[in-house]
A protein has these predicted regions:
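Alpha-helical transmembrane bundle of multi-pass membrane proteins
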Residues: 1-224, 245-464
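Short, well-structured alpha-helical segments
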Residues: 232-244
Length: 464
């Protein structure tokens, strides 16, 4: 009995001595603006695309309409390639500020464009900012978060994206009757971009980046702001176990692919690849037409999908630091596979069957819900945890480039595959990728819940 009491008191004492969340939360909240902009810009052209094509003179040109939507992905790919270098050269805070600039400029060009060329240029610039911002935001949030809150704060990135997608849809309702209303949608996006650029001036720099630069005194000062003076010394002692700034050399691509940490880089790329090959973006793309066939308006369809996404994000926020990243990933991918199996079943039923649309809708909403619980937020958080401090920014940039390439390929080939092999086989391929992801995660992913970044890095050091 006394032993149990000692254990309870010890647990309570440990809980009471954890760094307060109020110190780090404001900085995380500012970084989350990047993910809001990410969601907003990916969804902002979906609803007003017809009005844009009419006003700019390319109505009926499906190639031009497709470019307006997808050129953002090309810009994001380019941005992701340089995001690691920018984050390492200028620091996380300055990198986030720099990512806001092309989003500000690009959105302004889109809002004032008089031709297709102007719209494409603006979307390309916005995409470049989106390629730089999200990976740096994930780095920043991971590096400034206390260990016991890192999962919770990491989930806020996905919530920001969900809110951005919902905002892109809902913002059109009150202004849709105004001539050229789509221009207002682009102008509105400049507000959070400006807030991001200005607010980062008051945010702390990543202590990990400062230490990597050999600026130890500044790193300790930032740790005090994030954790409080009580915990800063211990955190600095942990930080000193990593490679010192003077030992840091430039990280080359060949080192990421063939160096001592190539295994974790390969794992990170695989997780992002499986995330895209699960079919999530194809589901988002095709959801409106499926809902319309069921007699539901496309606007309402987007709201349903958006709500399912936000509910999943909220669940992830609550569970990430309780049951861990690995469990969430396994449950998420497995449930996504089962949800996709429902859509395979629906695709095999007769279109006239009264239950076919219910199966489609149930499978689709469950798929989005379970994606948002694990497969959506966990990879970006997990990778910033398992990558060593020395290669973290460059490795994250490489993995994000894989993400954007596959995002583009799935979007490009989805409708063609539907026509050539039918929905049964397409959904079956997505289903198989989800179950393959379960096996990959179960065999290769380390649980990082509650561990400091230093503990994770030491645990993953290759045995030479």
């Amino acid at each position: 009995m006394e032993d149990d009491l000692v254990l309870v008191l010890s647990a309570l004492e440990k809980e009471a001595t954890k760094p307060p969340w109020k110190l780090s939360f404001p900085h995380v909240l500012v970084a989350t603006i990047v993910s809001f902009l990410f969601g907003y810009h990916l969804g902002v052209v979906n609803e007003p695309l017809e009005s844009i094509s009419t006003d700019l003179g390319f109505v009926g040109n499906s190639m031009a309409e497709g470019l307006v939507v997808s050129i953002c992905l090309a810009g994001a790919f380019v941005g992701s390639l340089i995001s690691g270098r920018i984050a390492d050269e200028f620091g996380r805070c300055r990198a986030l500020q720099l990512s806001a600039l092309p989003m500000l400029l690009g959105a302004s060009i889109c809002a004032t464009s008089k031709s297709l060329v102007g719209m494409l240029l603006g979307r390309l610039l916005v995409g470049t900012g989106l390629g730089v911002g999200p990976p740096v935001a994930s780095l920043y949030v991971t590096e400034i978060s206390p260990a016991h809150l890192r999962g919770t704060y990491g989930s806020m990135i996905q919530i920001g994206s969900g809110l951005g997608l919902m905002g892109a849809l809902l913002i059109g309702f009150p202004v849709k009757t105004i001539f050229g209303w789509w221009r207002i949608c682009f102008w509105i996006s400049t507000i959070p971009a400006a807030i991001l650029a200005l607010s980062m001036v008051f945010c702390v720099e990543s202590p990990y980046w400062l230490y990597k630069q050999g600026r130890n005194i500044e790193a300790e000062a930032e740790l005090e702001k994030l954790l409080g003076s009580t915990h800063a010394k211990a955190a600095m002692a942990e930080l000193s176990k990593l490679e010192k700034g003077g030992e840091i050399t430039s990280v080359k691509l060949v080192e990421l692919l063939y160096g001592r940490h190539s295994r974790v880089v390969f794992l990170g790329s695989t997780l992002f690849a499986l995330q895209q090959l699960s079919g999530i973006n194809a589901v988002f793309y095709f959801s409106s037409s499926v809902f319309r066939r069921a007699g539901v308006s496309s606007n309402l369809a987007s709201v349903f999908v958006g709500i399912a996404n936000l509910i999943g994000c909220a669940v992830a926020l609550l569970l990430m630091d309780k049951i861990g990243r690995k469990v969430l990933l396994i449950c998420s991918f497995f449930s996504m596979g089962m949800s996709m199996a429902l859509q395979v079943l629906a695709a095999n039923l007769s279109v006239s069957s009264p239950n076919v649309f219910y199966l489609y809708l149930t499978g689709m909403l469950l798929f989005v819900l379970m994606f948002a619980i694990g497969a959506g937020p966990v990879p970006a958080l997990l990778l910033t945890e398992i990558f060593p401090n020395r290669i973290r920014a460059k490795a994250m940039a490489f993995c994000m480039s894989v993400h954007w390439v596959l995002n583009f390929m799935v979007g490009l080939m989805f409708l063609q595959l539907l026509d050539q092999v039918g929905p049964q086989w397409v959904y079956s391929m997505f289903c198989a990728c989800c179950f393959l992801a379960v096996v990959v995660v179960k065999q290769n992913v380390m649980e990082t819940k509650g561990k400091s970044l230093q503990e994770i890095e030491i645990a993953l050091l290759p045995r030479d």
